[in-house]
Swiss-Prot record:
This is Small ribosomal subunit protein bS16. One of its GO terms (biological process) is translation. PANTHER family: 30S RIBOSOMAL PROTEIN S16, SMALL RIBOSOMAL SUBUNIT PROTEIN BS16M. GO terms for cellular component: cytoplasm; small ribosomal subunit. Pfam families: Ribosomal_S16. Belongs to the bacterial ribosomal protein bS16 family. The keyword DNA-binding does not apply. The keyword GTP-binding does not apply. The lineage of its organism: Bacteria, Pseudomonadati, Pseudomonadota, Gammaproteobacteria, Alteromonadales. It comes from the Bacteria. GO terms for molecular function: structural constituent of ribosome.
Length: 83
């Protein structure tokens, strides 16, 4: 099953997440099909907190990809920010 989920990066105590489309059988930070954005929960000042390619997300959801709970919330927030 294909899922859209967070892959953790960054240093210890300084998380940074890539939003990726991956096969659910692969490891959290392992092989992925496509990177569709990023989420930086510790962004300060003018730094971007969230960047998401909504066209690609909609494409993957239309082809049957499931989203994790956190990614579904981030997609909702991104759509609200665009509108």
């Amino acid at each position: 099953m294909v899922t859209i989920r967070l892959a953790r990066g960054g240093a210890k105590k300084r998380p940074f997440y890539n939003i990726v489309v991956a096969d659910s059988r692969n490891a959290r930070d392992g092989r992925f099909i496509e990177r569709v954005g990023f989420f930086n929960p510790l962004a300060r000042g003018q730094e971007e907190t969230l960047r998401l390619d909504l066209d690609r997300v909609e494409h993957w959801v239309a082809t049957g990809a499931a989203t994790s709970e956190r990614v579904a919330k981030l997609i909702k927030d991104a759509r609200k920010a665009v509108a």
